Amino acid sequence: MQPVVETLSGLERRVDLAVSVADVEKEVQAQLKRVARTAKVPGFRPGKAPLAMLERSHGPGIRYDVINGQVGRAFEQAVDGAKLRVAGSPTLEPKTEGVADDTLAFTATFEVYPEVAVPDLSALSVTRYETAVTDAEVQQTLDVLRKQRANFEAREGRAAQDGDRVTLDFAGTIDGVPFEGGKAESFPFVLGQGRMLPEFEAAAKGLKAGETKVFPLKFPDDYQGKEVAGKTAEFTITVKEVAEGVLPEVNAEFAKSLGQAEGDVEKLKADIRTNIEREAKARTQGRTKASVMDALVEAGKFDVPKALVDSDVQSRVQAAREELKQRGVPNAESVPIPAEAFATESERRVRLGLLVSELVKQAQLQAKPEQVRARIEEFAQNYEQPAQVVSYYLADRQRRAEIEAIVLEDNVVQHVLDKAKVTEEKVPFDQLMGMA
């Protein structure tokens, strides 16, 4: 008789399962006999230990596995018979009341996948982002590359300004007491690069070699050094050297230093344009994709399985803990990481995953082999040996699967853009690249 699956609420279901004690014992005895053929028991030759002795040593573990297996098969038959897709793992509780002596009974509580209704794509409003790379952006990038390769020359009597490398001694105290990391000698940094706190850089600006300055500095509340975060320190700095950054000329030697083998400056500029156009394209596509996915999630109204959300939350908690370990945080394993901090985003991710999966199935948006290869070849252009990168990805199934997932998302985005109400938005290059 097919077990009856009961609907509790929303996606939650319950079913009663039963297995025969006789069937369990029959399988247990069969497994014990198999173990007996090779079991090594002190005082007995291999395979000659009494079955009763093996029952005492191996029986409980074998019986546990057999019951789990038989209950698992009974559960699969029940949900298959009811044509249900189970989300996560069931919770099993033993039943004792009203159960015959020759039966083991359990109640399985579980969740099912929802019926995912893909929203009307023509009713969605999304934004397609674009940007333009002009000669000005190429020159701006060239200037950044020059600054990265600047030679610093000490200047007597020069007042420190942005772009200069300042070498100084500093010592800080809080309430008159020195603190860890608050003192250094001959410490170099380039003004204007944001390596130091803004108040520290502001204090150093305008000083010349040999000059000293005392100033207060309040550490931000979210400063990474927790022992000083939110507190005000008094710093004393003494400048030892101010060095002006001398930018290299844009010539053949400079072009060669950036990998342009022929030393051709115009070809270097063309390479720079190609690279920043590729990066700008990736960023605008990323913004467009985010707009599409946000619109899908906002319109996707259905329950999501709590089991899937909880699983995603736990994955994110574990990832956060691994990041703490990599940063060298002491006792990272015991640092409290509140799971509820990830709950909203995890629910969004699960909802989006279900929507995308259903949309791919309905519109047949699976990644085609030629699309995957084209994406790999495009990605490989970021490397010096693109052919090797292509071979590297094509030779490994898991790496190909990573690219297939990206292509699949691209297909979904394009499908939505083809049907939705699309607004075009130009993004200034500086803003797009985080330079504004």
Swiss-Prot record:
Q: Would you identify the family this protein belongs to, as annotated?
A: Belongs to the FKBP-type PPIase family. Tig subfamily.
UniProt keyword Lyase present: no
Instruction: Quote the InterPro entries the UniProt record gives.
Output: PPIase_dom_sf, PPIase_FKBP_dom, Trig_fac, Trigger_fac_C, Trigger_fac_C_sf, Trigger_fac_ribosome-bd_bac, Trigger_fac_ribosome-bd_sf, Trigger_fact/SurA_dom_sf
Reactions catalysed, semicolon-separated, are:
[protein]-peptidylproline (omega=180) = [protein]-peptidylproline (omega=0)
Assigned EC number:
5.2.1.8
An example GO CC term for this entry is: cytoplasm
Its function, per the record, reads:
Involved in protein export. Acts as a chaperone by maintaining the newly synthesized protein in an open conformation. Functions as a peptidyl-prolyl cis-trans isomerase.
In terms of SUPFAM superfamilies, this protein maps to: FKBP-like, Triger factor/SurA peptide-binding domain-like, Trigger factor ribosome-binding domain
Q: Which subcellular locations apply to this protein?
A: Cytoplasm
Q: What is known of its domains?
A: Consists of 3 domains; the N-terminus binds the ribosome, the middle domain has PPIase activity, while the C-terminus has intrinsic chaperone activity on its own.
One GO biological process term: 'de novo' cotranslational protein folding
Name used for this protein in its record: Trigger factor
Top-level taxon in the UniProt lineage: Bacteria
> Molecular function terms in GO for this entry?
peptidyl-prolyl cis-trans isomerase activity; protein folding chaperone; ribosome binding
Q: Using the record's annotation, list all stretches that form the PPIase FKBP-type domain.
A: 163-248
- Keywords for the protein's UniProt record, in alphabetical order: Cell cycle, Cell division, Chaperone, Cytoplasm, Isomerase, Rotamase
**One family name in Pfam for this protein:** Trigger_C
